[in-house]
């Protein structure tokens, strides 16, 4: 892996240097093998970009470039530049959430400054031939932060009230909460409606595609 960048500008320069390159070219330099597809290697693109950009946090709660206060997010896009899938933000806390505020939340920390890297995501393009797009450094506007905060507070209220099982992907205007587990057996602690501990599937916060589409549209228009 390349050393961690010491400044925001150094990180941006690195991201600009890999724009236009294919996954095959980037994997070759990193000594990584391109998988046939992403079905069993969902995190492969992120790991490839982390190697080239010198990200250190992996999937821990900290930002990928903690010393710079920047999170790295790849975003698969269509031929027309629209996001093809929701963006995972972080795992949702299901216990110990009483008194937790938006200002202290992992979601706010992760989204305070994001380096978005669009990548070609159309399925018919072989993975090795897909290319990386131009990077975009983004922080939420006051309006965007207000939207995120409102959704986060609503979703967390359901968790506090022990209604995690009733939350569906339809809840939340820009932020949604969905099960995040490779299989249905990976259960975690949560609260039931009676306040007693229950076992539940881990949940993750995800940004809806219409929210990320607006970010890309404003920047690349």
Swiss-Prot record:
Keywords recorded for this protein, A-Z: Cytoplasm, DNA damage, DNA repair, Endonuclease, Hydrolase, Nuclease
Keyword hit for DNA damage: yes
Cellular compartments per GO CC: cytoplasm
Localization, UniProt: Cytoplasm
GO BP terms in the entry: DNA modification; mismatch repair
GO MF entry, a single one: endonuclease activity
InterPro entries associated with the record: DNA_mismatch_repair_MutH, DNA_rep_MutH/RE_typeII_Sau3AI, DNA_rep_MutH/T2_RE_sf, Restrct_endonuc-II-like
One Pfam family linked to the record: MutH
Task performed by this protein: Sequence-specific endonuclease that cleaves unmethylated GATC sequences. It is involved in DNA mismatch repair.
Similarity section: Belongs to the MutH family.
Protein name as it appears in the record: DNA mismatch repair protein MutH
Gene: mutH
